[in-house]
């Protein structure tokens, strides 16, 4: 058989003397010698797969290994589809930004939030702009927030970090 290995020992690779065997229909066959378990699997043209090597004795199941791997891969893909990757998009504003430009940036943020992404809004201060950074930064971020507050919640409120004032917005559920 040319099947990709997923970390399971099967058939002749099983080196234990005795194993606990489960039939393909889920019935417990009990603890039997590995050679007998292999014979039973071969009679049914199936594989003996060790599914729990840490058990005493190890647990093996008689099954179609190719079908088993296919089902496992299918389950993994389904689980991966259900996971949602949350991206953090950054929108940068300057301390001297005009009202209209804030509106345009807010529309971009609205698109990101509707796509279930978080938005980090950053106001950058340069040179002398730092003298009034708290007042100016809070005013700009409040204006920005007023334009998008219907589609978001504030995850992290406005905070001064060095030469930047940042705020993180998350989509409304």
Swiss-Prot record:
Tell me which UniProt keywords the record has, alphabetically: Cytoplasm, Initiation factor, Protein biosynthesis
Q: Name one Pfam family in it.
A: IF3_C
Query: What does the record give under GO molecular function?
Result: ribosome binding; translation initiation factor activity
- Intracellular or extracellular location(s): Cytoplasm
Q: Which domain of life is it from?
A: Bacteria
Q: GO BP, one example?
A: ribosome disassembly
Q: Does the keyword Cytoplasm apply?
A: yes
Would you name any one GO CC term? cytosol
Asked if Disulfide bond is a keyword of the record, the answer is: no
Q: What InterPro entries does the entry give? A: T_IF-3_C_sf, T_IF-3_N_sf, Translation_initiation_fac3_CS, Translation_initiation_fac_3, Translation_initiation_fac_3_C, Translation_initiation_fac_3_N
What is annotated about its quaternary structure and interactions?
Monomer.
**What's the stated role of this polypeptide?**
IF-3 binds to the 30S ribosomal subunit and shifts the equilibrium between 70S ribosomes and their 50S and 30S subunits in favor of the free subunits, thus enhancing the availability of 30S subunits on which protein synthesis initiation begins.
Q: Which family does it belong to?
A: Belongs to the IF-3 family.
Q: State the name under which the record lists this protein.
A: Translation initiation factor IF-3
State the organism named in the record: Clostridium tetani (strain Massachusetts / E88)
Source lineage: Bacteria, Bacillati, Bacillota, Clostridia, Eubacteriales
Annotated gene: infC
């Amino acid at each position: 058989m040319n099947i990709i290995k997923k970390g399971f020992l099967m058939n002749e690779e099983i080196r234990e003397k005795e194993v606990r065997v489960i039939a393909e229909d889920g019935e417990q066959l009990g603890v039997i010698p590995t050679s007998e378990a292999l014979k039973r699997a071969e009679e049914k043209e199936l594989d003996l797969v060790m599914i729990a090597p840490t058990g005493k004795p190890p647990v093996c199941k008689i099954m179609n290994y190719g079908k088993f791997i296919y089902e496992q891969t299918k389950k993994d893909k389904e689980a991966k589809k259900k996971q949602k990757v949350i991206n953090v998009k950054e929108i940068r504003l300057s301390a001297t930004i005009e009202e209209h430009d804030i509106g345009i940036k807010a529309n971009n943020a609205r698109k990101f939030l509707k796509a279930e992404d978080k938005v980090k809004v950053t106001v950058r201060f340069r040179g002398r702009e730092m003298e009034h950074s708290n007042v100016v930064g809070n005013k700009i971020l409040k204006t920005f927030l007023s334009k998008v507050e219907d589609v978001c919640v504030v995850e992290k409120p406005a905070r001064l970090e060095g030469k930047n004032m940042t705020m993180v917005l998350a989509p409304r559920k």
